[in-house]
């Protein structure tokens, strides 16, 4: 089984959209998937129609809840909902070994799944550190602009001490360009070339697949759905299908 953290320290790069599409696409291929929402914005939890009476990721991290009690079900797989109180996680998690809280909790259920996907906040915090400590690999969504790629480079600086101190086996699956409008402009082509160079510096790759800009992604979220069910014939759905196939082929 594989635990994948989807992260970028820059906001607006499509982390939640990518996690949701991965969850749906892998589920449709017959894989058993668990998603963990660690973002205090709770967007993934909202899309998955989380129940408010169940324990959340916060309870898992503080030890106040059993992970099996926190697992909810959706049409595209199981998930653990976020909590807005996770914004205080750096203060709430103040015990020795706080970096390992999520890893320890997932150890109790990981045998039940083929993939566990972790959606993270757009910031370096104890939440992101827990996600990186618990996972096998990392997918970095990035939009085609220079600031997003700077976020990728900052993330790489975070992963190095994680690899040294809390998770020696972690590796970066690759950088995924999202909200892409094509190579028609010199700027987009330049940013794509920069993304390739950034990937090489991180000893990883730029995925061959790019996720194009499409209103269907936001529409699917507004309908509390996923791109595969909402717009199965859309070009962006084909993009996500190709991305998932590329990811699985690298296994």
Regions found by a protein language model. Name each.
Residues 1-251:
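P-loop NTP-binding core
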């Amino acid at each position: 089984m594989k635990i994948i953290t989807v992260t970028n320290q820059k906001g607006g790069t499509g982390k939640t959209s990518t996690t949701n599409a991965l969850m749906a696409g892998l589920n449709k291929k017959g894989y058993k998937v668990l998603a963990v929402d660690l973002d205090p914005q709770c967007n993934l939890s909202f899309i998955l129609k989380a129940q408010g009476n169940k324990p959340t990721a916060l309870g898992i991290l503080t030890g106040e809840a059993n992970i099996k009690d926190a697992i909810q079900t959706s049409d595209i797989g199981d998930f653990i909902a976020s909590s807005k109180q996770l914004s205080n996680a750096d203060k709430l998690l103040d015990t020795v070994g706080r970096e390992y809280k999520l890893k320890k909790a997932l150890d109790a259920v990981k045998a039940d799944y083929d993939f566990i996907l972790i959606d993270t906040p757009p910031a370096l915090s104890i939440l992101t550190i827990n996600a990186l400590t618990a996972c096998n690999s990392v997918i970095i969504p990035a939009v085609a602009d220079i600031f997003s790629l700077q976020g990728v480079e900052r993330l790489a600086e975070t992963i190095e001490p994680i690899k040294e101190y809390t998770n020696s086996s972690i590796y970066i699956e690759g950088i995924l360009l999202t909200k892409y409008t094509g190579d028609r402009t010199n700027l987009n082509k330049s940013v794509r070339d920069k993304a390739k160079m950034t990937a090489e510096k991180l000893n990883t790759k730029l995925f061959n697949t790019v996720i194009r800009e499409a209103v269907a992604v936001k529409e699917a979220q507004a309908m509390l759905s996923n791109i595969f069910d909402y717009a199965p014939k859309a070009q962006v759905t084909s993009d996500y299908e190709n991305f998932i196939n590329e990811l699985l082929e690298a296994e």
